[in-house]
Amino acid sequence: MTTAIRRAAGSSYFRNPWPALWAMMVGFFMIMLDSTVVAIANPTIMAQLRIGYATVVWVTSAYLLAYAVPMLVAGRLGDRFGPKNLYLIGLGVFTVASLGCGLSSGAGMLIAARVVQGVGAGLLTPQTLSTITRIFPAHRRGVALGAWGTVASVASLVGPLAGGALVDSMGWEWIFFVNVPVGVIGLILAAYLIPALPHHPHRFDWFGVGLSGAGMFLIVFGLQQGQSANWQPWIWAVIVGGIGFMSLFVYWQARNAREPLIPLEVFNDRNFSLSNLRIAIIAFAGTGMMLPVTFYAQAVCGLSPTHTAVLFAPTAIVGGVLAPFVGMIIDRSHPLCVLGFGFSVLAIAMTWLLCEMAPGTPIWRLVLPFIALGVAGAFVWSPLTVTATRNLRPHLAGASSGVFNAVRQLGAVLGSASMAAFMTSRIAAEMPGGVDALTGPAGQDATVLQLPEFVREPFAAAMSQSMLLPAFVALFGIVAALFLVDFTGAAVAKEPLPESDGDADDDDYVEYILRREPEEDCDTQPLRASRPAAAAASRSGAGGPLAVSWSTSAQGMPPGPPGRRAWQADTESTAPSAL
């Protein structure tokens, strides 16, 4: 016999977790804002600091690489010391590093400060998903993650617009200075509104962190510098060395029986595994496309940073409007068909855009594929996050969110590095003078990368051809979605749980809360009804893991893995014997 337990009044954040969510979104918003702002400012930074294309790309890649590496351990650090504490540390580091970026007088100092920024962002981001997973029940998590996606979309809109206006009026340094007051406000809100969740003891696999960091750095460095080094043998040796480090990292995680950096059990969930593949694909495509489109808009079309930002605005507006509705849809239905639709629109929109990237294309024709990209983003980001986290056990929340975000950042940094190599090769093939023509004018008054008239057409062709890479990669997202869609409908539970399901709602999430967060003055009432056979069968795995996942979430219950342990209690007891 089990008990139905009412939480005490002190646990208000489980009943109303929204203030904590909005407090966390301030820091998340600032990180997303920073990414889009720098993309718009890259041509101006390149012109004013008198640096070449290969160097300015490191302003983005260094940040993304430093962002990705600590996220693997940041989830565990959040579990050990509390996600609130790690969030505050990450936001503080990011804010101070933003000040350093704005004070930079050269490319070296700017890139170094961007690395510190990335570390702060890497510590902060996993705490948002981990906290959402722990304070929102499964049946409300889709709406919460829809709001999370809306914040990202709004940042994608505000970031380029604000960044373009700041670059045009005050200089590129102010795209970093603006983070300082926002960061201070975010720290104050987080300190008061984010709950202090229970800590879990963890060991930290620092050897694994070193292996993964070395592997990712070598791969990214080889890809990004390969074209400029004419793909000499030492470049290939660097890339192979990076792959070797990553292979050793995977082997070490499999052998580490104490507590691996990545608990491989999270990949037993097919949804989580394929969601990681697809988040890497969308991050690769999204980050990769920003580089050629931004350079095309400013160097070929002659748009200012502000006008370039306006060109991206339809994507953010459409994505922000649709994201909450998509969140409600996936709370009530299987998200896998939604993902297939989203990735299809993404591939079509990118192909459409590359066909329009010519010197004489009217601006209104460029806006149309950007609208389609907004539709694609709304139908990809939130469904991916919900699919990845819906079945995860609470004690894996920190590690799994760290893995998910690290894979996303790894996809982004690989997209940036691969695009750097691909763009450089296309520029060398299409333009007289090759990459040297991209150094642009020097001087503090240069805000737009200016090209001679006779090279604008070949440069536009090079940028258009560069868009083939993210468009091609987006196709793999469609393939990944098809692997999960069961056209016979067997993947979705056909019979819901009975209305009177006894103690079928006492899943691992409830047990976790009762064990980790005991409350005083809780009223307990014994439930006399026995577990229905249908509910017990679904909990034991009948119908497959997807059937368990979507049938429980449809009933508004936090999902638990199949095969939960049976409580052994006397029929006259008022509490489970395990408690």
Curated annotation (Swiss-Prot):
PROSITE patterns: MFS. Keywords: Cell membrane, Membrane, Transmembrane, Transmembrane helix, Transport. SUPFAM superfamilies: MFS general substrate transporter (SSF103473). It holds the Pfam family MFS_1. It is found in: Cell membrane. One of its GO terms (cellular component) is membrane. The keyword Transmembrane helix applies. Residues 516-579 are annotated as: Disordered. Residues 570-579 have a biased composition (Polar residues). Disulfide bonds: none annotated. It comes from the Bacteria. The chain crosses the membrane at residues 20-40, 54-74, 86-106, 142-162, 174-194, 204-224, 234-254, 279-299, 310-330, 335-355, 366-386, 467-487. GO terms for molecular function: transmembrane transporter activity. The keyword RNA-binding does not apply. Residues 526-540 have a biased composition (Low complexity). It is a multi-pass membrane protein. Belongs to the major facilitator superfamily. EmrB family. NCBIfam families: efflux_EmrB. This is Uncharacterized MFS-type transporter Rv1250. It comes from Mycobacterium tuberculosis (strain ATCC 25618 / H37Rv).
